[in-house]
């Protein structure tokens, strides 16, 4: 990855100095795109759980937009991409229909999108370390909660979010290009009282 003064970097919170989260640069678009395609093609039961289809979800436009807005992050293991996610420092209007534990303004919340772990790193605790660094970043930006959604069919992700402290808050039946009409489940991690090594 290219170096830049805009590169936000956090050392891994579990003491692994070679693990870090970094902001994706515009020049890294092709690398990120290919990594998402690799994840879709090589993740077991992708068609059953996350049901991602590249070009429908995620899309080139989606990834480029996150990068352009400086919302796309990589979790690196040395020079290797271990995981990827988009972090928006606000929530979208579709989140307004859910009864959350706190009545927060859109810009008091961070939302996670297209979070994924590279095939060679799945099942190795990368998600836990990455979420710890996301919490540090989000708290540094003054947010009070992290919110996200997952397909009802994505049982591995839902189990993971529960283990990481996210609370189930409700569901909506929505249309997506890759799934058609389906249930989306919404999760929240209130940040009050959560301490990290960077806070």
Feature locations, PLM:
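A short beta-loop-alpha structural element at the N-terminal edge
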Residues: 19-35
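Conserved GNAT-fold acetyl-CoA-binding loop/helix
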Residues: 41-62
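Conserved beta-hairpin
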Residues: 70-87
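Conserved acyl-donor/pantetheine-binding loop and adjacent beta-alpha core of acyl/acetyltransferases
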Residues: 85-114, 122, 175-178
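Hydrophobic adenine-recognition pocket in adenosine-nucleotide-binding enzymes
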Residues: 115-117, 150
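Conserved acetyl-CoA-binding loop-helix of GNAT-fold acetyltransferases
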Residues: 117, 123-136, 159-163
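Conserved GNAT acetyl-CoA-binding A-motif
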Residues: 131, 138-150
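C-terminal "cap" of GNAT-fold acetyltransferases
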Residues: 151-154, 162-164, 174-199
